[in-house]
Amino acid sequence: MEDTMFLEKIAQTVADETSKIIGYQVSIADEKGYLIGVNDPARFGLFDKLSLEVIKQKKMLHWTPRDVVDLPGIFPGSSAPIIVNNKAIGAIGVIGKAEE
């Protein structure tokens, strides 16, 4: 099974279970930056250009309220790439104050 297909199959479960453990909302984006695992169903399928930036740069980034002011449905927090076989296949984000 292709890595990206695998991510699509587990994204929602990973987002839900991780959120329960850490106490913060979690989102997972596919390799094109679309949310495929989210705690708020209204956000499913949203394009998250910040996650796409994380995927392109292959590094963890942090977003402040100022960074997301013009991005409806996107929230401040931290996001890291999901890398398999040296390829960024998506990103996982944790919603909250970047300083936390």
Each language-model region and where it sits:
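Alpha-helical/coil-rich non-catalytic "connector" segments in signaling and regulatory proteins
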Residues: 1-100
